[in-house]
């Protein structure tokens, strides 16, 4: 006499359930209803955004999210007002997909209009409160193409070049203890990747102060072999050599790489 068991069998089918095929990565574009503003020409501007979610993170209940802010459209090839081209030109999707730390990615298209920058419209549009709301909007957009609506585990912010006009004001809000930096997505900030960001001494100070104000957050500053940002940073550190860097801030001089090489070669390294 024997007892027949059904471990590993699907009831009623008599066969083991085949493993589910992995979902393909999610790639989509959406228009943000959070980052909207009236520009210097009194025209309403919206923000097109590209999302990439690696296959390994599809339908996960909790995810890390990378927000990457690009610079001016001066690198080759150009991105031509298309956030998906920013992703492809800098291989951000491939880097995120292959990174040890798995994370979803969103790249908003920033309209780097000189008048709008000078008048503060862009930095206002990306101030702390709007960043928090934007992250929630991104999670909602991911949910539309998923079985679950993910919640945020950790936030990673990255930026290149002219993105100083977003990262520096945000850094100063953190340093001043602005309430929105202590709640929502920004309360879950775990990493900042700043590539050729400082263009003025104030920017270098802001990044250092940001690191000091959030000792649990890791900061990575990457610099090209030549140009204004590495020069500014070198001068700043020489002037303040007696002040040690925060222990959670590292800077890297990429002595063989040009300004436009940085995001495409190294962004994934710092995730």
Residue ranges and their predicted role:
Residues 211, 220-271:
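C-terminal catalytic histidine-bearing segment of alpha/beta-hydrolase fold enzymes
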Residues 169-188:
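Conserved hydrolase catalytic core segment
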Residues 108-110, 191-201, 224-227:
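Active-site nucleophile loop of the alpha/beta-hydrolase fold
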Residues 75-78, 114-118, 165-167, 200-205, ...:
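Extracytoplasmic/secreted cell-surface and envelope-processing proteins
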Residues 1-65, 103, 238:
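A domain-start/cap signature at the N-terminus of enzymes
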Residues 148-161, 192:
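Alpha/beta-hydrolase fold nucleophile elbow
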Residues 70, 158-170:
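Glycine-rich nucleophile elbow surrounding the catalytic serine of serine-hydrolase chemistry
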